[in-house]
Amino acid sequence: YLDCISPLAGGFPAVASAVDVGSGAGFPGIPLAIMLPGMRFTLMDALGKRVDFLRTVIDRLGLNAVALHLRAEDAARQEDLREGFDLAVARAVAPMNVLCEYLLPLVKVGGHMLALKGPGVDEELAQAENALQLLGGKVERVQPLVIPGRDWDHRAAWIAKTAPTPRKY
């Protein structure tokens, strides 16, 4: 799962808190929490069994993280979570336009959204242009993720949160 930590090589921003939306088995949140022990992670998933697993992993590894049984849409309605994170990350969760709706409401203005994607990211970003503008995001860069020994075309799309997300999202 080197693709989860590869964004660290490209100038990872100094942040205090991050949320991994749709964490599933803990990717990318668990590898990032291992590599960045000073950052507070929240791992979020809609399935209770996955969250139980995440809590076990967090406890056994002694990570600076919590796991929440929560959908992103519901998290955005909670005042303590809405625009409460410096960074929101996701890997293999949804197309970019939908992912923006899940992640950007959770990111503080001045923070970032990080989407771990495949070779179609440029097309996805073009299709998400309206969503980005509406939700307060702006594409900062697309970072190729080089995985030693693998011929994969993985990319990290960095979205800067430049304005508050309207309350209806």
Task: Describe the residue ranges of each PLM region.
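Conserved SAM-binding loop of SAM-dependent methyltransferases across substrates and taxa
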Residues: 25-38
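Hydrophobic side chains within alpha-helical segments
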Residues: 3-6, 23, 53
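Conserved alpha-helix/loop element of class I SAM-dependent methyltransferases that forms part
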Residues: 1-15
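Conserved class I S-adenosyl-L-methionine
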Residues: 14-24
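S-adenosylmethionine
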Residues: 36-42, 46-169
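N-terminal cationic-hydrophobic initiation segments that often serve targeting/anchoring roles
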Residues: 8-9, 33, 104
